[in-house]
Amino acid sequence: MNDAAPLGRVVATERKPNTPHEFHFWTGLDSPVGIGTIVRVDGPVPVNGVIPRIYGTVIEGFSYTDLQSPLHDVMSADGDPGNARRAPTDRTEIRLYTAAVLRHIPEDPLQPVPMGEVHLADENDVAVALRMDGYLKEGSRTGIPIGVYRSGGTEAAIYLDADFLLGPEAAHLTITGVSGLATKTSAVEWMLSSIFTHFPASKGSVAAVCFNVKGPDLCFLDQPGEIDETDRALHARCGVPPLPFQNVQYYAPYKSDGVSINTLRSNEALQDNVAPLTWGLREVLQYAEVLLNKDDVDAKADALIDFIRERVVDREFRDELLGNRVHIVRSFAELEAWFKDVLQAVEKTNKESWRTHHVATIRKVRNRLTNISTRCAGLVTDEGNVSDLPFGNFADRTVYVVDVASLEEDAQDLIFARIVTKLREHLEKRDLGVNHVVLFVDELNKYAPGDGPDTYVRKMLLDVAERGRYLGLVLFGAQQFRSQVHRRVAGNSGTALYGRMDADELATPGYSILAPAVKTKLASLDKGQLMVRHPHFTQPIFVRFPRPAVMRGRDGAEQFPQALEVSFESAVLRTLRTLDPSLTMTWLQDAMGIQEQEDIVRARNATMRERPADVRKYFQAQLRPIVTASAGPRSSGTPVRSGPVNDPYGF
């Protein structure tokens, strides 16, 4: 117990009584107490033989004098503020604070806070007040540092319980704040570093999948950033090395030309861990509803899509109307040929339907499906080339960044839907490669809004929020307006972080439980400050976290500018050089010869997917052999018949 002199005493009046969850106390004018300060009350009378101790956090402050009316002060100074300095005595002023109870010891019986001495909480008191002592025990330590609490000279690292952050007891995290000032992205980067450092080995392995949805925010996580000594001290206090992420893999689709990867991380010096993200018909068809307009595609069209998915794709398909010819559909190009044969056969027989599917429905579905590769060019290929995340081979403490910042909304939705669904499927089978996955989604109020149509992506995020913790799939979401996020997504987040908040957002009903002084502090937080809500904390706590030791997006964009647009040959060579730096333009030109551009792209994609030991040999083996005609003796042609001797137009 702290033996220091008390800084105040609990006080209660009939108008302001103390309760089991709230109490009031007064302090001296020089007391280091402010909004968010944690204090301890020592009761004067033992309860069941134990001196009660009550811990609380300050949520409101008041200042009083003995004035009955402001008019009395004006009259005493004759209306001149300067005369107040010459008053024979100073007016008595007191500071009165209101604190919300964090914890009672003993917890039973639960009684109103007694009239005891108030002490500033020390480091041990902070741990007890926030119930961190229960999960910071040696041998069963599950604490993940979130930041440092500082107030009145007390400094204490604040820990979250891994069982309530990554499951299975509770899970998910959301961070809210205004753009640019709330440091939402930095907070998530810091949390991932902290998790990778402190997540107990006994709990299994953990990885992160992050969607970069705007600018270069997450494009340089493996590059060191500049931090000052204050940030280094905070890193040391939390036991997290000030280093960038050691294992990061980047994925992005190609641009529409199918040659250059569509990412802001295109500098040649950073290409060793950048891989293309491309899918074919098999990978996309399961998520066709993401790209189809529900107002346009009815139940009949859905039935035909299900038929194609279950009976046609990746199967030997025969039909009497098609002459029992075998169709094997594995790509969008082969799907288009299948549709063409079906429609031609139906037209020849003058039928209006085929296998209960009307011709109009077949044409509609054909138009909707076969243009997916055009709408999502660069991501979806006609030929069916696949380059994907390493599902089944995820590595521990690795960050997988999927850059979708430069993509259209349709392509973004398709990527979200497929990757999250695949993560869930593999975690259910326990064959992903890791036990836990942190899924970071920025702009959560866009992808899981509280109003608007019930999209596939929103339903998927709702499912993750409600059932993901049992699988080890944990959602980390960032948004500017928490009030606009779907209630079931926000409500299922066990931990909530708040940076600087907008006054309009604070005026919404979701923040009505906060005291006015706490709202005022939220609206003026500095960068690096957060308000934290966690299942073990009965009241919000203010902490400061360090700037992550990774390069910020805008700094990386300046230091590693995007690669300039280059010729087709140069783009192919630049990609292949990430596997074999010894490749030359002369070799590539000789290998390409007179090959078609589509064939070269196909060979390049296969090489990047397989990553062979001998890149030269493998790439050349993927190119189609060029058959040249043999040079034989030239046949003599039929002689031209000569014209009349006296032809006036002859030569």
Language model features with spans:
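P-loop NTP-binding catalytic core
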Residues: Q111-H172, G556
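P-loop NTPase motor domains
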Residues: F199, K203-V206, C210-F211, G215-L221, ...
